[in-house]
């Protein structure tokens, strides 16, 4: 049984140079792929007790939400969003963290779907509740201490998925301090896809994006961004390319930039 989930959410300006999270539920209500439910990262799939937005929720919370969406044993899930693709890959990555592998990303998302004049709907699906058996996997989420060790030992490639301007400290939203985690490299999630269709670039082009910054499929790779969203897009592609030791720094710059003792660079 296939479940289709619209994973759209929004990062909105907060008026102070930062961003705030906004659910994409109203966007889903207005139009979605026929048969698609809405997976609400903001209200259902983030740890409300955490200091930073979008943090991985407790296993019980995640399992309850997925069960309510009709996702469980014997189901396959197709994920998409209406913006950058990173909301869909974030939920794909969380499913992976909790041991569910029958999840797929709709290449190009709703943007490409609409470019191709495919049908849209405003009707909610009637997926029956499922039983989601979470089997948490270690090593797919990194924390601050691991990232700090990684930039000191040099054996791990730490990749910033934010824009080039943000990486250099020249513009875009910042998280208290401009720039990047010291000694990290930059593969913007936005550069992984075609600017017209929003479909991913070819496997060869994607592989070159990562190899050009020193990523090695034989070594550990940690992707980060502002709050673990764009980073999941990099992590998704790395996984498709055969990298087997990839993690997302969950709190990312929301945590790192807020701590003045942690090293950062600009330029």
Regions found by a protein language model. Name each.
Residues 1-267:
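Cytosolic catalytic domains that perform sulfur/thiol-centered chemistry
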């Amino acid at each position: 049984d296939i479940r289709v989930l619209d994973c759209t959410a929004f990062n909105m300006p907060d008026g102070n140079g930062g961003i705030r999270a906004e659910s994409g539920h109203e966007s889903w209500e207005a139009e979605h792929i026929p048969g698609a439910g809405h997976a609400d990262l903001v209200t259902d799939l983030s740890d409300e007790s955490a200091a930073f937005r979008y943090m991985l929720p407790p296993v019980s919370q995640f399992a309850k939400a997925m069960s309510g969406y009709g996702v469980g044993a014997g189901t396959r899930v197709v994920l998409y969003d209406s913006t950058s693709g990173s909301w869909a890959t974030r939920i794909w990555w969380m499913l992976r963290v909790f041991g569910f592998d029958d999840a797929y990303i709709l290449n190009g998302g709703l943007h490409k779907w609409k470019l191709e004049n495919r049908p849209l709907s405003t009707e909610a699906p009637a997926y029956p509740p499922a039983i989601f058996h979470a089997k948490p996997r270690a090593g797919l989420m990194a924390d601050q201490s691991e990232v700090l060790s990684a930039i000191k030992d040099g054996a791990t490639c730490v990749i910033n998925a934010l824009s080039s301007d943000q990486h250099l400290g020249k513009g875009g939203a910042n998280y208290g301090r401009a720039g990047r985690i010291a000694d990290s490299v930059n593969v913007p999630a936005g550069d992984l896809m075609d600017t017209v269709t929003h479909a991913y670039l070819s496997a060869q082009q994607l592989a070159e994006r990562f190899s050009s910054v020193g990523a090695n499929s034989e070594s550990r790779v940690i992707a980060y961004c502002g709050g673990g969203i764009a980073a999941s897009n990099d992590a998704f592609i790395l996984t498709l390319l055969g990298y087997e030791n990839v993690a997302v720094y969950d709190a990312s710059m929301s945590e790192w930039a807020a701590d003045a003792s942690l090293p950062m660079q600009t330029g």
